[in-house]
Amino acid sequence: MFEVFVKKVNSDIVIRWLLTKITIPIADISAVTTDDTYSGKEKQAIRIGMPYGTTDRVVIITKKNTYILFTTNYIAIQKKLNSYIHSL
């Protein structure tokens, strides 16, 4: 229930968490990485998910914003995002 969900819709990535829905054009994504700090290195990032001690962080860097996804399933989300980016 508190997990972050990521899916591809046409040429966009849709991120859902609780009542939040964020749409990012795939063409705007420049990198997908991980972050091992507690709150994320990027101070101005948009944070999505529950930031508690055992979560990992997936970072999406776009032309305009940086998004930090707090998740316990970071490998699957990172693989999914990379496959969406390389499918264009």
Where are these regions (language model features)?
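Conserved beta-hairpin
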Residues: 1-25
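Short hydrophobic/aromatic-rich beta-strand segments that constitute the beta-sheet cores
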Residues: 13-16, 32, 69
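A short beta-strand motif that forms part of the nucleic acid-binding face
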Residues: 19, 28, 73
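A structural signal for the main folded, soluble domain(s) of proteins
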Residues: 20, 30, 64-67
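Phosphoinositide-dependent membrane-docking surfaces
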Residues: 23-38
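An anionic, turn-rich surface loop/hairpin at beta-sheet edges
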Residues: 36-54
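Canonical phosphoinositide-binding patch of PH/PH-like domains
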Residues: 51-76
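Glycine-rich, low-complexity intrinsically disordered segments
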Residues: 79-88
